[in-house]
Amino acid sequence: VDKQIGSGAYKLTLVSESITPWENDLVSHDATAKEYIVINSTPGGLKKAITAANKDYTKIKNLKITGEINAKDFYFMRDSMDILQALNLKDVRIIGTNEHVNDGWSDCINKDDQIPHFAFNGTGRQGKKSLNYLVLPDRLKSIGTRAFFGCEYLSGSLTIPEGVTEIQQGAFTACKSLTGSLSLPSTLVYIGNDDQSNHEDIDYSCGTFAGCGFVGELNIPEGVKEIRGYAFDNCKGFYGNLKLPNNLEKLGERSFFLCKNLTGSLSIPQKIKIIPNECFNGCGFDGTLTLPNGITSIGNSAFGDCHFKGELSLPKDLRIINNYVFYNNDFSGELKLPKNISVIGEKAFAYNWRLMGTLEFPEGIQSIGAGAFAHCRSLEGLIFPESLENIRWESSWSEDGGAFQGCYGINSIVCKGDLPAYVQTGAFEGVAKDNFTLEVPESAISQYQAAPGWCDFKRIAAHHELVCRPSVACALSTEHKQKLVINAEGEWEVASKPDWCEVSPASGNKKTEVTLTIKGMAKNADSRDGKVVFRLKDKDYTHECSVSQYGYEYGEDEWITLQKATKG
């Protein structure tokens, strides 16, 4: 390459050339060239065709097949070609036998253009150990049950050809040496069997790609409708965002269990109604979780031990929150529970320490499981409905067995039931029971004072309706105005306030919108805080709004120019 004097243009001159035949240049195609023995076969006649070519099938390592073959030929390769390493099926056509095959677990029929069931997986689920390289047929519609199950030395990347609509249970289970990329065709509809009569209890040992070593992004085609149980279980090499197809209708148990390098946000498609047990447990998601309103059930540990952030919006039709569903995530903000919830399982929200505000349990809820909100230390208040029957504690879980164990931030509890719910011994372990008043119906004060669990609270008094939302206001040095909403059962008034705050109006009746004004202060002055106390008239019942103001060298909403430049 020479730069021309004057014009500055570049001139390219070819000084030499070297052309290497593709089959000899192993660098350019990742050393995939093989010295194949090429056999043209007829269905069921592979052994005969190899013999006719004067080849010893027991000594063949690299085999390319053309023509047509059937299940009998696959089982011959599986059971008799002991050192077969590389198999190229690119130009072959597979003819179905329409015969039932059964290995004691599954009963299947081999069809046209389908890699036969158990093709390289024999008795006792032993995969073919010698096989390490595979090219699938261009003309292919299906990969049968456990076709390559346990072929643990099958290596490199895997490309499923266009035209394939299903990859059945166990097709590539435990192919741990597949450490390249996985490419799925746009025609794919089912990952796992689409036969509804095929019970899912076999999925636990036959996830389609379970235990594979793929490394790269996982791109699931938009046409996929079903991902069966354990499909990508323990596929720890997949990384990046996971986009589930909009057409997806069904997910199986542990579909993506322990795919710990999947990150970003996750959106569950609208057609999904049930998220089964451990579906995404142990994944590395660090963005937000979006759940459609049509979901009615979320199974045990479905999203446990992920790292989701942001607010959690639960589906409005959700009825049961099972054990460990959102355990050990990083959700924040106020949690709104759907009105139809009846049970919250063990450790369902444990260790989501950024959940905050007042948590109100809907009427109809009956049980709150052991450790359900353990160590949600930013929760400030609880409101329990009349329907609540029990709040549980598991003594063998020393640090997180109580439903609200370690929730140190709780400073308000309201119980609406005339009959106290049964509270097990350590349900509120760590909650400061002498720092606030437990509010209960006036007619039930004596029952709560004598009830197990509730009697540990030092102050129990009648509950009245008086609340301010929001109950926290913060400002910088400049004057700050903020709207508050007062909900009261009757007339209310401002009982006290800091002299640097104003509330207008200062009294009202039932629901009222007021303006809180925090007056300006000198820049860099000491910070200050206080409480605005609202009181029901004629009752010794109050509610507080915490206010704080921070001295700062700049005012709120003030534009700051740190540096100016006119050039460069």
Identify the function of each model-found stretch.
Residues S477-L484, M521-V532:
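Short, solvent-exposed loop/turn segments enriched in Ser/Thr/Gly
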Residues E35-S41, K61-I69, L84-E99, D103-D113, ...:
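Structural signature of tandem-repeat unit edges
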Residues L466, N487-T515, W559:
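Surface-exposed binding patches on compact interaction domains or structured appendages
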